[in-house]
């Protein structure tokens, strides 16, 4: 089952990843085993915002990323290529996927997932009840 929303000339697709019970526990273990050597971007409220790990260290991340690519094509008509490493010659030094780890009560600020991307996604691996709320805004609005 999925929900499709129109927003600012684009589309937002909400979908539950099938069989998440089969891969989320493995991905959480892989993340926690490797988080100490993650590359970090910047801090928000005292915590590291984006944690970048090599896909070889979090191999189960391929499952939701491939699912997002397939949903983009099937539900949105967007053909895309999955990148697990920065493009050669790119000024971007981090892989194009990352993890955010927040304790209860912590949150992130306004940011853009779609800079130079035709498809972007968010997967919640574990969160408290009534958390994980996404807020969207139009260009020029805050």
List each language-model region with its residue ranges.
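Non-heme Fe(II)/2-oxoglutarate
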Residues: 1-88
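Catalytic core of non-heme Fe(II) oxygenases with the double-stranded beta-helix
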Residues: 93-142
